[in-house]
Amino acid sequence: MKICGLEKFRVFLSLISMVSLLCNGVNGFTIVRSMAVNGESVPDRFSNPSCRPSDCALKRASTTNGCSTTRDCCSCQCSKTRATYLTSPFNRCTTSEYIDEDCSSFFVLPDDSPPPVADITKPGHINFFSETRCHKGLRTRSWSHSVDATSWTTGKPNGFSVELVEGSSSSWKWRLSWQNGMDAKFSGLIIKLEFSCQNTRSGCFLMKSKGNYTIPNSEQWPSIIPTDVSFNLTGENANPTANSGTSARSNRNEQNKMEEPARNQAELEPKKTGVVVAGVTVSLAAGFVLALATLLLMKKKQTSLAVNAKARPNSYLGYEEPVDSAGRPEQTATESPSFDNEFYTTDCVLSLSGNNVGGKVTRMGPLPPLPGEESIYAEPMIKRSVAYQGLAEKNKQQDAGTACNVQPQPECKVIEKTSNENSHDKGTDEDKG
């Protein structure tokens, strides 16, 4: 099966995503604050790196809702009475008294009622109640966010507004609104809104932002001891206020300090286990990615070799004699090997008609080429130097090349005169006389 480049890219992205999720699941710590369809708040859920039910119980999570719907207990859920999960120094599910202890009694929540959950990433509003009415001039002075309800960071911009809906002598209903959605980075945090009034009264209101908040590593944030001092936000001197339950909260803080070493020791073991699991998981994922990359490279190389082999010409095939099927239907064309011999040609092969005992066509080897037209043999002419005895001594000293060019002297013949010639000669003599 050929894997295209796009499929390789998708497989690679899937592997990277899987490794990232595994690493985040082990090294990260996630807090989920959610709400039901009808708008009611749902107890917080948080990740459990060790995936053991005993660790959920250690963090004061509900025994019935302590684990998620999966078989492994990798997600714990707080109970309704302890619906809010706080990080260090608590690191467990807590009640409302641990959250609103920094707020004065001007705006309060019902007893044992957790802070409401609101989605601040889009425009909306939420209603809350107070025991005291600000007659006029109530405004949202500032707002801040936190993950542990002890260290607060001022949030910007301030897009919250508050107005009175209705009230009576004992309870007043307010509406908190925000026209623009906030940044998604504030999801999963605890939001504190601080109000001021013209009659020098001040107070705050707490709510939880809907969404997930993930701590990048397994190390919890440093412990910050909460204070029992309430601040007057009207600009006057900040003095401690006699809030109800202050002494009881101080005792609980002291008790938490004493229980902190034991909790840290109990939480140290799952952290070590999580680090080991993270190392093994990353190693296995890296090995799997390496094996897959090697397999893909080998597959690509084999495909390239196959394509090159198909493109290469078949030079090893020999001469195949054409067969006339009409003249000799009983014979079939067979391949003959090529002969690499300087005295023969590869295109001249003798094929005998008829089959041998084995039923195969009888063939002979290549024939020598036919002789061409031969020329008539002519004996070469040999020129020799001949010396004649009658030559002068100086002719004998000439070289062989000059002697070859000497022509023999012509022979002299004596011709006898006839009778006619004699009479003619006599007449001539007489005339002369």
UniProtKB/Swiss-Prot annotation:
Keywords: Membrane, Signal, Transmembrane, Transmembrane helix
Biased composition (Polar residues): 235-250
Top-rank lineage group of the source organism: Eukaryota
Annotated region (Disordered), positions in chain: 235-266, 320-340, 413-433
Subcellular localization(s) per the UniProt record: Membrane
Topology class, membrane: Single-pass membrane protein
Keyword Transmembrane on entry: yes
Signal peptide: 1-28
Extracellular compartment spans: 29-274
Biased composition (Basic and acidic residues): 251-266
Keyword Membrane found: yes
Main subcellular location: membrane
Tissue: Component of the acid-insoluble and acid-soluble organic matrix of the aragonitic skeleton (at protein level).
Transmembrane regions listed in the UniProt entry: 275-295
Cytoplasmic membrane side: 296-433
Gene Ontology CC: membrane
Protein name listed in UniProt: Uncharacterized skeletal organic matrix protein 3
High-level lineage: Eukaryota, Metazoa, Cnidaria, Anthozoa, Hexacorallia
